[in-house]
Amino acid sequence: MSAKINSKKLEMFDLLKKFIDNKQNLFFLDYRGLSVSQLTDLRNKIEGEHGALKVVKNNIMKMVLKEKNINIVDSCLVGPTVVVTALEEANVIAKIFYDFVKSSTLKVKGGFVLGEFYDEAKVQAYSKLPTKKESISLLASVLKAPVSKLARTLKALADIKN
């Protein structure tokens, strides 16, 4: 029976290892009090933005993180835990689960973003950053403003001469 348990744990270890392979962004959430349908809804929203959500066993996750040399605060792996990964824009994923926090019992424990541990407050601040698309739009409008002003000035000058 012991061999059966160990093989299951080893299989779970390998699955979690593959789950976080090549991921630079990990978030740890406490899903206590969420219904299955709420968790499924959260998972669908996260997957819609190129992220993934997995319910994990804390001890096995600790071993995986240790093997990957990822250092996080132990409190991130206490109680019911889901790990959320982001393939692209991690702050978009963070916005999704912070929107979810407002209407549910979901709690953010912390995260690991681009090689640095983020506590709950840092993850929340990170979630408020503009997305890549919003940043590009803002930059475009900033670059466009002087050109538009010059065009209006030249048009006004031409109107005065006529």
From Swiss-Prot:
CDD domains: Ribosomal_L10. SUPFAM superfamilies: Ribosomal protein L10-like (SSF160369). Keywords: Ribonucleoprotein, Ribosomal protein, RNA-binding, rRNA-binding. Pfam families: Ribosomal_L10. Gene3D superfamilies: 3.30.70.1730, 6.10.250.2350. GO terms for molecular function: large ribosomal subunit rRNA binding; structural constituent of ribosome. One of its GO terms (cellular component) is large ribosomal subunit. InterPro entries: Ribosomal_uL10, Ribosomal_uL10-like_sf, Ribosomal_uL10_bac, Ribosomal_uL10_bac_type, Ribosomal_uL10_CS_bac. The keyword Ribosomal protein applies. The keyword Nuclease does not apply. GO terms for biological process: translation. Forms part of the ribosomal stalk, playing a central role in the interaction of the ribosome with GTP-bound translation factors. Belongs to the universal ribosomal protein uL10 family. Part of the ribosomal stalk of the 50S ribosomal subunit. The N-terminus interacts with L11 and the large rRNA to form the base of the stalk. The C-terminus forms an elongated spine to which L12 dimers bind in a sequential fashion forming a multimeric L10(L12)X complex. PANTHER family: 39S RIBOSOMAL PROTEIN L10, MITOCHONDRIAL. This is Large ribosomal subunit protein uL10. It comes from Borrelia garinii subsp. bavariensis (strain ATCC BAA-2496 / DSM 23469 / PBi) (Borreliella bavariensis).
